[in-house]
């Protein structure tokens, strides 16, 4: 197992936990900025050097900007590099070796926002749709050559992104949110079944069906939800 994080201490701590839980497992940690293609390639190269190959690449990093049209060009570029380009960097780094042996798996953390939308954050909604689009393309293009792809698409997950580092943040997705452990368990099941969409909140599938069945009705419903959220939580409501 290779553990990567922008925070070197955080990556090392997770690696230590993995090693304690599975003493026979080979583990290493490496600080990586996933927005940096060379850094992602370096991670893949080091994992390949240590382990011989990369079987599964879990592309998990993501950020949110609670902005709409006021988001600057720099804001858009930053979230694009992390929420979209990180997945592309991962594919570029390990797809060649996967294709050579005819087997490999990309597990990309995306969001239900990539299937639906995100009230309160235009950059998040747009980049998560793009992340789904890239994963679909990857599966369509290489699925018959042994490459498997899964997208994890939860709604609220009980992490610092949702609650803030000190639990100070309030938002409509906190109700009904699930633990990271729940997401992990559902993800393991989804990967075992080789499902493209992994939905820790099963109701998201029904929301997605309704969107496809009657887009205009879905948009009207989302506008009502938007108004309700803004009244209850104000402008920063994610």
Residue ranges of each PLM-predicted region?
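Conserved glycine-rich Rossmann-like NAD(P)H-binding loop of the short-chain dehydrogenase/reductase
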Residues: 1-13
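The beta1-alpha1 cofactor-binding region of Rossmann-like NAD(H)/NADP(H)-dependent oxidoreductases
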Residues: 8-9, 31-42, 73
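A glycine-rich helix->loop->beta "capping" turn
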Residues: 21-26, 46-57, 65
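Conserved mid-core segment of classical short-chain dehydrogenase/reductases
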Residues: 63-77, 120-123
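Active-site helix of classical SDR
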Residues: 91, 127
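Residue(s) in the substrate-gating loop at a strand-loop-helix junction
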Residues: 111
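SDR active-site lid
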Residues: 140-203
């Amino acid at each position: 197992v290779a553990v990567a994080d922008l925070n070197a201490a955080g990556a090392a701590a997770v690696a230590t936990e993995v090693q304690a839980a599975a003493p026979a497992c080979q583990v290493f940690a490496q600080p990586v900025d996933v927005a940096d293609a060379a850094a992602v390639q370096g991670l893949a190269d080091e994992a390949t050097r240590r382990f011989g190959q990369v079987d599964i690449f879990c592309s998990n990093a993501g950020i949110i900007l609670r902005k709409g049209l006021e988001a600057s060009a720099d804001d858009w570029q930053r979230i694009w590099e992390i929420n979209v380009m990180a997945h592309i960097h991962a594919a570029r780094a390990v797809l060649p070796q996967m294709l050579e042996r005819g087997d490999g798996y990309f597990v990309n953390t995306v969001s239900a926002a990539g299937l639906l939308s995100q009230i309160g954050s235009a950059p998040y909604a747009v980049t998560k749709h793009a992340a789904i689009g890239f994963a679909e393309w990857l599966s369509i293009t290489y699925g018959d050559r042994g490459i498997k792809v899964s997208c994890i698409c939860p709604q609220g997950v009980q992490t610092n992104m949702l609650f803030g580092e000190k639990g100070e943040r309030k938002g409509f997705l906190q109700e009904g949110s699930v633990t990271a452990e729940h997401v992990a368990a559902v993800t393991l099941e989804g990967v075992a079944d080789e499902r493209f969409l992994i939905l820790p909140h099963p109701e998201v599938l029904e929301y997605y069906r309704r969107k496809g069945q009657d887009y205009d009705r879905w948009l009207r419903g989302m506008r009502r939800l938007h108004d309700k959220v803004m009244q209850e939580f104000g402008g920063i409501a994610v």
